[in-house]
Amino acid sequence: MRVVGILPARLSSTRLPRKPILAETGKTLIQHTWEVASQATSLDAVIVAADCDELADAVNSFGGHVELTGEHLSGTDRIAEVVERCCPDAEIIVNIQGDEPEIDPAHIDAAVSALESHPDWQMTTLVTPLTDPELLASPNVVKAVCAEDGRALYFSRSVVPFSRDESVEKVLKSGNSPWRHHIGLYAYRREFLLKLTQLPPSPLEQLEKLEQLRALENGATIGVVEVSESAPGIDTPEDYQQFVARWREANG
């Protein structure tokens, strides 16, 4: 089964302009992420889906595989263009965020393995236990509600499931949190990904601004894999400086 990882990337980030090619460590951010993703043993290829020539040149400079795409509303649409044009023999496509240079390659492998093991699932994603009340309350932290058999039931920016009888603090103190933090890594079956990106935005997707709800609202099964922790994303200048500090500490 051929599996391809694709990193959607663009220079026009509003909170952190030119994010993929920031290079205070001596390597661009997109190179860090590409190199880590390439360590996933499940992937036969890793491709960067770039939005402009400057970014494509940066990827070519370190020997990465890059495909230039047109303008798109989402990273998923950007990936679909690359898949349709360049990956005719791929069976599974993994959407890897281009701004997560500390992602664990084993997490990529776990998402792929779960999809390979469940032929009735159309896609898989990751979650991690959510135990911090501040993160739980934040609309920027997406919560996942999961069934016992590993299927996703819903994703929301609200606190779901809702605890009617006990406070959030009391539930968390019990040491058995029912809440899960959704991690935005996805493994798709190729044909399902192409079909999904042709569907119009769904009502709940538009309400929550969560693209994965389009799949649920159209009857797809999303499998969920729980991992112990999530890699910090880089969305702001502060996030990037913290990454640089961690990298320098780890690399002397």
Give the location of each predicted region:
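A general structural signal for well-ordered alpha-helical segments in protein cores
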Residues: A56, G75-I79, I108, A152, ...
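Conserved core of the sugar-phosphate nucleotidyltransferase
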Residues: I103-S202
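Conserved alpha/beta core of the MobA/IspD/sugar-nucleotide pyrophosphorylase nucleotidyltransferase superfamily
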Residues: P88, E169-G252
